[in-house]
Swiss-Prot record:
Domain of life the protein comes from: Bacteria
Keyword Nucleotide-binding found: yes
Record text on subunit structure and interactions: The complex is composed of an ATP-binding protein (RbsA), two transmembrane proteins (RbsC) and a solute-binding protein (RbsB).
Entry's family note: Belongs to the ABC transporter superfamily. Ribose importer (TC 3.A.1.2.1) family.
E.C. designation(s): 7.5.2.7
Subcellular location per the Swiss-Prot or TrEMBL entry: Cell inner membrane
Name of this protein: Ribose import ATP-binding protein RbsA
Gene name as annotated: rbsA
Length: 501
């Protein structure tokens, strides 16, 4: 193996009440892809923020291209040849793709004016490399979340960096977009670029990475080549124990029909009908753009319905806003927890109780003691790792933020809980905890809708599965009669009946 182009040795970083990094180390080699693995809260993102100068380090050393380095901030590290593609996109919806890619370093003519034709041409070349079909003159806001992620990647490529850090780069990508990204990674690897690949998707690690570094509780656990381990060994390194069963589904006797949807049509949704019983988990599968999230938002009241009937406990409802949906007993946990679900500048307590203040109030007075008791109960029940209920939620790991988002929905004591991509960006240990919580609510008779892009998750946790394509339901299966091939056939628009299956 070549000499490392980047070495982080025994890095330490502490925040009030938390030691985020405790002698964490990472080596990045030219022409190789290094997976950085660990549970949420293991210190992966903190280590990258120390590297790029967002956080100062308390101890340890950074060596880049054989020289000791300490970057003053992201611009400094970027100019030195280290780019980071964050899990949360740093883009402006109101600007064009090209303007986003070259923001702050626009291509100019000899007279100091922006050379628009040249800038669009360079941006179009980058988009072509990533197989993005849009013109760089397109406004970013017109793109899907997955396409916006590809623009973020194009922006990093424009720096011709020697080290590129990708933090959960495929979280919002379709299979086609993911394969395009992998082609670019292979191309960059051939050019001698060192890549740090942060992901919880074990399949991707074994497909695209050469080496693996594992962190746990801020500590360096080990480094190995991908060919030297397997999924079980990697999980054990990450969580410090064996996970016996990935999807711990339980069988519960279902009760009466709780939710009935008849001929529902709305934004991106066409003539959808289904039922949901008490104590049942209904999985919703489909490819990106199939209309799954839109369907949930119409049911919840976040998007308008044009026609159709929604019956909840034999009573027709017509939610016209999220507040209306909550008041009727429907809680929706968004796929975009940082955009729709949480207020990052508020505390754990404030976020968790935000939607339940009416239930925690007498008249206009919030019963703060009741609020504290309820929040503390959820922190304990969900095993949320936080120094206190007053901790700013933006400082928590992704897995713990997701647990708070789910608790926030449950604080309203809903009849129907809609979970949209509940384990996106969450590590294997936190996933298992979330699955166990879902089972607990199921056993208590709650009706749950589980929307997920991960087919094994839908198959593993659901009792019954609906598949969507272009806003319509193209398949319905009992989970025990379904498999990935049947779900994928329906997801691309092929009608598959359970009898034929």
């Amino acid at each position: 193996m070549n000499q490392a182009i980047l070495q982080l040795s025994e890095i330490e970083k502490a925040f009030p009440g938390v030691k985020a990094l405790d002698k964490a180390s990472l080596n990045v080699y030219p022409g190789r892809v290094m997976a950085l693995m660990g549970e949420n809260g293991a210190g992966k993102s903190t280590l990258m923020k120390v590297l790029t100068g967002i956080y100062s380090r308390d101890a340890g050393e950074i060596v880049y291209q054989g020289q000791s380095a300490q970057f003053k901030g992201p611009r400094d590290s970027q100019q030195a040849g280290i780019s980071i593609i964050h899990q949360e996109l740093n883009l402006i919806r109101e600007l064009t793709i090209a303007e986003n890619i070259f923001l702050g370093r626009e291509i100019t003519s000899a007279f100091g004016r922006i050379d628009w034709p040249q800038m669009y041409a360079e941006a179009d070349k980058l988009l072509a490399r990533l197989k993005v079909k849009h013109s760089s003159k397109t406004l970013l806001g017109q793109l899907s979340l997955g396409e916006q992620q590809m623009v973020e990647i194009a922006k990093a490529l424009s720096f011709e960096s020697k080290v590129i850090i990708m933090d959960e780069p495929t979280d919002a990508l379709t299979d086609t977009e993911t394969e395009a990204l992998f082609s670019v990674i292979r191309e960059l690897r051939e050019q001698g670029c060192g890549i740090v690949y942060i992901s919880h998707r074990l399949k991707e690690i074994f497909e695209i990475c050469d080496d693996i570094t594992v962190l746990r509780d801020g500590k360096f656990i080990g480094q190995c080549e991908v060919v030297q381990t397997d999924e079980d060994g990697l999980i054990e390194m990450m969580v410090g124990r064996k996970l016996e069963e990935q999807y711990p589904r339980i069988d519960v006797v279902h009760g009466q029909t709780c939710l009935e949807v008849i001929g529902l049509t709305g934004s991106g949704v066409h003539d959808v009908s289904f039922t949901l019983k008490r104590g049942e988990i209904l999985g919703i599968s489909g490819l990106m753009g199939a209309g799954r999230t839109e369907l949930m938002k119409v049911i919840y009241g976040a998007l308008p319905s044009e026609r159709g009937v929604i019956n909840l406990d034999n009573r027709t409802i017509n939610p016209i806003s999220p507040q209306d949906g909550l008041a009727n007993g429907i809680a929706y946990i968004s796929e975009d927890r940082k955009g729709d679900g949480l207020v990052l500048g508020l505390s754990v307590k404030e976020n968790m109780s935000l939607c339940a203040l009416d239930k925690l109030s007498k008249g206009v007075q919030i019963q703060h003691q009741d609020e504290v008791v309820a929040v503390d109960d959820f922190i304990q029940l969900f095993n949320i790792k936080t120094p206190s209920r007053e901790q700013i939620i933006g400082n928590l790991s992704g897995g713990n933020q997701q647990k708070v988002a789910i608790a926030k929905g449950l604080m309203t004591k809903p009849k129907v809980l809609i979970l949209d991509e509940p384990t996106r960006g969450v590590d294997v240990g936190a996933k298992k905890e979330i699955y166990q919580l879902i089972n607990k609510f199921k056993a208590e008779g709650m009706s749950i809708i589980l929307v997920s892009s991960e087919m094994p998750e839908v198959l593993g946790m659901s009792d019954r599965i609906l598949v969507m394509h272009e806003g319509r339901i193209t398949g319905e299966f009992e989970a025990k009669h379904a498999d990935q091939e049947k779900l994928m056939a329906c997801a691309v628009g092929k009608k598959v009946s359970e009898e034929a299956a």
